[in-house]
């Protein structure tokens, strides 16, 4: 029976697979993706993560984000988030 059903499908919810009630499966299935765990960076004593987000390169200036480069000079991204359709 394990080879008949795809991974994540409860056989009790769909006894005649592949003819299933999609609303019932969506209601009772867990579709939340697993969040991978990433260990936090180990900052040495005296170095604040807020002051140096790209440690150990604290002296280097972080490049501008992609959304900042797309706006022309004088247009702030927070003032007009859907540029060029500003109101």
Curated annotation (Swiss-Prot):
Disulphide bond pairs: 14-20, 52-58, 80-86
Disulfide bond found in the keyword field: yes
PTM sites of type Pyrrolidone carboxylic acid: 1
Coiled coil start-end: none
Family matches, as InterPro entries: CPCFC
Pfam entry (one): CPCFC
Domain of life: Eukaryota
A GO molecular function held by the record: structural constituent of cuticle
Start-end of each Sequence repeat: 5-20, 43-58, 71-86
Signal peptide: none
Keyword list, A-Z: Cuticle, Disulfide bond, Pyrrolidone carboxylic acid, Repeat
Name this protein carries in UniProt: Cuticle protein 1
């Amino acid at each position: 029976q394990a080879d008949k059903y795809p991974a994540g499908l409860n056989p009790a919810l769909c006894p005649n697979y592949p003819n299933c009630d999609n609303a019932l499966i969506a209601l009772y299935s867990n579709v939340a993706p697993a969040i991978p765990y990433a260990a936090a960076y180990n900052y040495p004593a005296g170095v604040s993560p807020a002051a140096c987000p790209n440690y150990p390169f604290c002296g280097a200036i972080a490049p501008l984000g992609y959304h900042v480069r797309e706006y022309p000079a004088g247009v702030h991204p927070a003032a007009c988030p859907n540029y060029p359709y500003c109101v």
